[in-house]
């Protein structure tokens, strides 16, 4: 993998404190094992990879409630990119419910190309963008309209995706980064592991404390234009 440090869009402070910030990107080379990159904490994004406090689950240890399996029978799914209209409709409802602002995935056609669409009574109610490798499944972004919250589509989606991943021979299910209190729930799922920067940890308490700390940090907008 070729590693790039972006010092143009990065910034630093050296007069009264030592601070250097630069985005770090990785570009896989022809012979790189993509599952090995995931194993070492890298996550894919468009044509580059990045390091993150990523979260994954050992598929051999995941257990699902009977209620989730029962509700899953009410949902039909199909592979393929949802229409722009459906993406906008579902993403808006999902963001309003969660209080999220960022739309970087929902506006990314490349990410949406590989999606699983979820239908209830013939209506598209949710979708997940994903990537599939030889031994790894990555759930990049999930969204649903919350019109029937009793369905708990998030649990059903995770059940279906885990089942498909196992059938494809995957060992791990990756769910991108674990930051802020909105990601606390990720530590409550069987088979949970998170990337510390040097190893995969099963320490739930430390992970939860870090997520809570994230939510206390305030970041002011930094204008890096020259």
Predicted stretch roles:
Residues 44, 69-150, 162-164, 180:
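A conserved beta-strand-loop-helix scaffold within acyl/acetyltransferase catalytic domains
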Residues 150-158:
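Glycine-rich acyl-CoA binding loop
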Residues 37, 91, 158-161, 186:
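Residue-level preference for non-acidic, small/hydrophobic
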Residues 1-76, 175-226:
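Terminal substrate-recognition subdomain of acyl/acetyltransferases
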Residues 17-20, 146-147, 168:
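A short, structure-level motif marking secondary-structure boundaries and short turns
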Residues 165-177:
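Conserved GNAT acetyl-CoA-binding A-motif
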């Amino acid at each position: 993998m070729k590693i790039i440090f972006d010092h143009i869009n990065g910034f630093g402070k050296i007069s009264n404190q030592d601070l250097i910030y630069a985005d770090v990107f990785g570009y896989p080379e022809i012979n790189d094992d993509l599952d090995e990159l995931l194993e070492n904490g890298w996550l894919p994004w468009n044509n580059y990879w990045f390091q993150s406090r990523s979260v994954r689950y050992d598929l051999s240890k995941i257990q699902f409630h009977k209620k989730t399996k029962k509700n899953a029978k009410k949902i039909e799914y199909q592979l393929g990119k949802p229409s722009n209209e459906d993406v906008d409709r579902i993403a808006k409802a999902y963001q309003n419910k969660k209080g999220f602002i960022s739309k970087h995935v929902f506006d990314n056609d490349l990410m949406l190309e590989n999606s699983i669409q979820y239908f209830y009574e013939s209506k598209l109610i949710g979708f997940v963008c994903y990537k599939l490798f030889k031994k790894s499944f990555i759930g990049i972004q999930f969204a649903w309209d919350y019109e029937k919250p009793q369905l708990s589509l998030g649990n059903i989606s995770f059940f279906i995706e885990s089942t498909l991943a196992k059938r494809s021979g995957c060992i791990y299910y990756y769910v991108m980064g674990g930051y802020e209190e909105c990601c606390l729930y990720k530590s409550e799922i069987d088979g949970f592991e998170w990337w510390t920067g040097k190893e995969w940890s099963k320490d739930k308490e430390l992970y939860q404390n870090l997520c809570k700390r994230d939510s206390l940090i305030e970041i002011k907008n930094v204008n890096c234009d020259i």
